[in-house]
């Protein structure tokens, strides 16, 4: 017979690093060209006017301006940047 108790090991104890996803700039906020607006997986929010989409679906401002979130249809969200000249 064993004189020591067999010690099992838990099969838990792992987790992935946080990915810091989500909306980074609010509606009505002024942004500079190149600013990241949304970090996401897939196109949950679609790029609108003056907004580009990166290879990892990150949305970024192409011009200086004011952020505008819109809803088109029942379930499609878009984010646009209204240029500074037009916003004044």
UniProtKB/Swiss-Prot annotation:
Which Pfam families did the record assign?
Ribosomal_L27
Q: Where is the signal peptide?
A: none
Give positions of region: Disordered: 1-21
Provide the alphabetized UniProt keywords: Ribonucleoprotein, Ribosomal protein
What PROSITE patterns is this protein classified in?
Answer: RIBOSOMAL_L27 (PS00831)
Q: Does the keyword Ribosomal protein apply?
A: yes
**Gene3D superfamilies per the record?**
2.40.50.100
Keyword match Ribosomal protein: yes
Q: Which GO terms describe its cellular component?
A: cytosolic large ribosomal subunit
Name under which the protein is recorded: Large ribosomal subunit protein bL27
Give the encoding gene's name.
Answer: rpmA
């Amino acid at each position: 017979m064993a004189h020591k108790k067999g010690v099992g090991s838990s099969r838990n104890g792992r987790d992935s690093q946080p990915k810091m996803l989500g909306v980074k700039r609010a509606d009505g906020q002024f942004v500079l060209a190149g600013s990241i607006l949304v970090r996401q997986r897939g196109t949950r929010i679609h790029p609108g006017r003056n907004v580009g989409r990166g290879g990892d679906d990150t949305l970024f401002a192409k011009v200086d301006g004011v952020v505008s979130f819109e809803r088109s249809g029942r379930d499609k969200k878009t984010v646009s940047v209204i240029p500074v000249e037009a916003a004044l």
